[in-house]
Curated annotation (Swiss-Prot):
Pfam families: Ribosomal_L33
Keyword terms: Ribonucleoprotein, Ribosomal protein
PANTHER family xref list: 54S RIBOSOMAL PROTEIN L39, MITOCHONDRIAL, LARGE RIBOSOMAL SUBUNIT PROTEIN BL33M
HAMAP family linked: Ribosomal_bL33
Protein name per Swiss-Prot or TrEMBL: Large ribosomal subunit protein bL33
Disulfide bonds, paired cysteine numbers: none
Length: 56
């Protein structure tokens, strides 16, 4: 039987305050720091900073 992976689901939430988010997963062992990406927010129609928050 395979062991459980070390990956955790995360939510990347827009810093523009629109409430838009992307979901993804990351390996906690290789990247323990919080992720930040410039991604497209369709509500403001611009690329904005998305920061990692825990998926509930």
């Amino acid at each position: 039987m395979a062991s459980k992976g070390g990956r955790e689901k995360i939510k990347l939430e827009s810093t523009a305050g629109t409430g838009h988010f992307y979901t993804t997963n990351k390996n906690k062992k290789t990247t323990p720091e919080k992720l930040e990406f410039m991604k497209f927010d369709p509500k403001v129609r611009k690329h904005v900073l998305y920061k990692e928050v825990k998926l509930r």
